[in-house]
């Protein structure tokens, strides 16, 4: 047992004893005492993140106010701004005086979960799920793959998941992420241009945007220079543009840079010839002044600010409505280079999934009550609100109106947002945390969001037909040893690849640089990493 674990055990011994007694006493009570609302107000403690420039007190958000009224459970929150979360949550998890009963929006990686489990900072939840979490149990019963994805190699579940189904397989909304590529249809029409279908045609369109900058500025009242194409490298990423080069793998996984071949082999996308050739082509665009010079360093707010000024001809994002006027844009289909292909995002065939969304800590004096309260987040009527927002707000916009489904049951109907940005309204209302929104819920408990529906339609129309890849890397829960071994090498591998992407687009790449790059990745442990990924892929398909 390591020193940190011994120290934590000494500090928490008294708290754990009290917690065990409370848990045993709850179990022995009559059934109605554990049904909400509780007879007396009870206080639990939790940690949560919130988006910058939104309400910082969770208990002032309508969702949590309603939950307190319905349960008689008051939550004392430690609220941390989202852009400070990673640093502060790490410190809080290491300090018993800062720990709360649960961490609502943990967002922990597998490495985090297994480390905190080893230190006994968090508790296993599988028994609580089976005994007092009927909503989550129902999700696991209907979709057993999610329980499998939450369970470690020793059979423990250390966290409660976030699950969002919007489509399935190659039509799932997550198959194309922040790399969805949009082109300014208003500009195309004004200049008499067609939507490009090849990389050569695409370059010609960008040149036309550049060469007709003054006409575009005059016609549409644009202040500031015309930017033929912008993105945020390794975030709002241009990987779809190079998907057709070489073997057609592209590079959609900007965290791990892996893909799965049709022969079920895990490969590194960044060591394929198509990766090099695609970035060399993008260097040509950069040399022509067709790419925003800030695309490699800008943050989200800068990116959006320029987009809202109407300066972009092409850009990448989850939803163009967050950047510019939706009606002025259309999706850019896959471009033909050596081939034509769209590589889906890894893990996307089972929908949106986050294994480490919420944890219960060892300081919880009544973990059963904590789990009962958290199970309410998986109620089919509650989950959509936690995920997107709610109804009955006092401000200008609501995400939902309270309506009825075809059977007369209550249903959340998405409300019109006018010119408001969907992400801004959602951030003002939603609370996140553990939840499950399933395809079965649409038109029963909630309508499909308009912005999700048009995105689903776009994927099915423009991208699914060109998803020639049969497999994506699935969500797997590796052992602590393999997780640690990967963590030891993945960071250097990812940093090297991400840095090379920016460098090669700006400065080009020589054959010697390419060989040195591959040698560096091998020295960092690329082959060992691929072996670990392959082991779990083989096991996944052997089941």
Listing of model-derived features with the role each one plays in the protein:
Residues 201, 278, 284-287, 303-320, ...:
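Glycine-rich, aromatic-lined ligand/substrate-binding cores of catalytic
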Residues 48-52, 79-84, 93, 104-108, ...:
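Short, flexible loop/turn elements at secondary-structure junctions
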Residues 380-503, 508:
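Conserved small-residue motifs centered on glycine
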Residues 65-66, 317-320, 445, 449:
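Long, His/Glu/Asp-enriched segments that create or flank divalent metal/ion-associated functional microenvironments
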Residues 120-150, 206-210, 220-259, 310-326:
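Carboxylate/His-rich catalytic cores and anion/metal-binding grooves
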């Amino acid at each position: 047992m390591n020193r940190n674990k011994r120290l934590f055990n000494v500090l928490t011994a008294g708290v754990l004893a009290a917690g065990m007694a409370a848990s045993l006493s709850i179990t022995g009570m009559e059934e109605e005492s554990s049904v909400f609302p509780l007879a007396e107000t009870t206080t639990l403690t939790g940690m949560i993140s919130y988006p910058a420039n939104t309400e910082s007190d969770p208990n002032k958000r309508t969702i949590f106010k309603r939950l307190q009224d319905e349960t008689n459970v008051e939550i004392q929150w430690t609220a941390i701004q989202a852009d400070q979360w990673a640093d502060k949550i790490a410190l809080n998890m290491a300090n018993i005086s800062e720990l709360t009963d649960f961490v609502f929006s943990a967002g922990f990686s597998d490495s985090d979960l297994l480390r905190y489990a080893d230190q006994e900072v968090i508790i296993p939840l599988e028994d609580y799920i089976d005994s007092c979490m009927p909503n989550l149990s129902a999700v696991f019963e209907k979709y057993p793959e999610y329980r499998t994805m939450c369970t470690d190699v020793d059979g423990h579940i250390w966290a409660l998941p976030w699950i969002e189904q919007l489509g399935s397989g190659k039509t799932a909304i997550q198959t194309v992420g922040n790399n969805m590529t949009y082109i300014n249809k208003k500009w195309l029409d004004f200049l008499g241009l067609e939507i490009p279908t090849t990389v050569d045609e695409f370059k010609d369109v960008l040149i036309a945007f550049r060469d007709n900058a003054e006409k575009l500025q005059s016609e549409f009242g644009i202040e500031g220079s015309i930017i033929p194409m912008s993105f945020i490298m390794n975030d709002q990423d241009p990987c779809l543009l190079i998907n057709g080069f070489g073997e057609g793998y592209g590079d959609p996984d900007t965290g791990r840079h892996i893909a799965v071949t049709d022969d079920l082999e895990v490969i590194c996308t960044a060591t394929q010839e198509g990766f090099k050739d695609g970035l060399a082509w993008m260097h040509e665009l950069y040399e022509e002044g067709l790419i925003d010079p800030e695309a490699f360093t800008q943050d989200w707010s800068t990116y959006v600010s320029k987009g809202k000024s109407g300066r972009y001809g092409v850009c990448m994002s989850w939803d163009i409505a967050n950047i510019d006027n939706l009606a002025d844009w259309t999706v850019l289909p896959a471009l033909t280079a050596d081939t034509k292909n769209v590589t889906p995002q890894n893990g996307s065939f089972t929908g949106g999934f986050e294994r480490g969304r919420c944890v219960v800590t060892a300081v919880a004096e009544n973990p059963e009550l904590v789990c009962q309260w958290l199970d309410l987040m998986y109620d089919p009527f509650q989950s959509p609100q936690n995920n997107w927002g709610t109804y009955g707000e006092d401000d200008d916009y609501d995400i939902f109106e309270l309506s009825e489904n075809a059977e007369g049951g209550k249903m959340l109907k998405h409300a019109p947002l006018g010119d408001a940005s969907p992400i801004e309204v959602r951030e003002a209302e939603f609370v996140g945390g553990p939840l499950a929104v399933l395809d079965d819920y649409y038109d029963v408990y909630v309508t499909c969001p308009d912005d999700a529906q048009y995105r689903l339609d776009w994927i099915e129309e423009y991208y699914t037909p060109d998803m020639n890849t049969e497999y994506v890397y699935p969500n797997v829960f590796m052992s602590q040893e393999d997780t640690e071994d990967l963590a030891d090498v993945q960071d250097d591998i990812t940093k090297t690849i991400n840095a090379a992407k920016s460098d090669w687009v700006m400065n080009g790449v020589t054959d010697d640089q390419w060989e040195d790059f591959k040698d560096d990745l091998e020295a960092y442990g690329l082959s060992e990493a691929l072996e670990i990924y392959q082991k779990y892929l083989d096991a996944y398909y052997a089941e």
